[in-house]
Amino acid sequence: MMIQTIKTTPYGDQKPGTSGLRKRVTVYQQPHYVENYLQAIFDSLEGFDGQTLVIGGDGRFYNDAAIQTAIRMAAANGFGRVLVGQGGLLSTPAASHVIRHHKAFGGLVLSASHNPGGPDGDFGIKYNIGNGGPAPERITDAVYERTKVIDTYKTIDAPDVALDQIGTQHSGEMVVEVIDPVADYAALMETLFDFDAIRALFASGFRMTFDAMNAITGPYAHAILEDKLG
């Protein structure tokens, strides 16, 4: 695997908050903007060589392109395995559960929450640590300091991962597993709620309306409300 070291110059606006770095899509589309921020994250972490990184997002515009960049950079920086949701999809709570369930080192969640998406909308990248929660301030502060001085980032020359195909692929020498974005989370919900009782409620004639217009809610609603409870 040939690792490429690409020269870059810092951007002055890459200060993450507790919800990561949220900017307009047009900002993220600037040359090396995504790469600078991802490299700053990796440079601020220790002990991940050969470890697992979870990647997924809410499916908004620019999600796929950023995920392909993140996969190649994860390989170049020494991760041994990436778990990515099919279609590049993982809701924030599902990503948190996948991180914990698979004992991953951490994860990249690509979302701007309720902010509007689209080419003229918003995009975001957030790093979650091994317990599934957001990176603490000591990490986000370190990331910001690194973004101010970054002059190179690492990547590899590799084809895009087929995000729609569940199964194992490779990016360079790194294993990439495309997983069902809903399965682990739906199984978790069955341990937290009495699905038999909820099924009985629906069978009794109970009806409800569910608004799945926000972010990535739809696939989870289909799997849980229709397939498991309907």
Question: Where are the regions a protein language model picked out?
Answer:
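Ferredoxin-reductase
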Residues: 48-134
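Positively charged, low-complexity intrinsically disordered leader regions
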Residues: 1-38
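Short strand-loop junctions, especially beta-strand C-caps/beta-turns
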Residues: 21, 26, 56-60, 130, ...
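Generic structural signal for well-ordered alpha-helical scaffold segments
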Residues: 39-46, 96, 100, 190-197
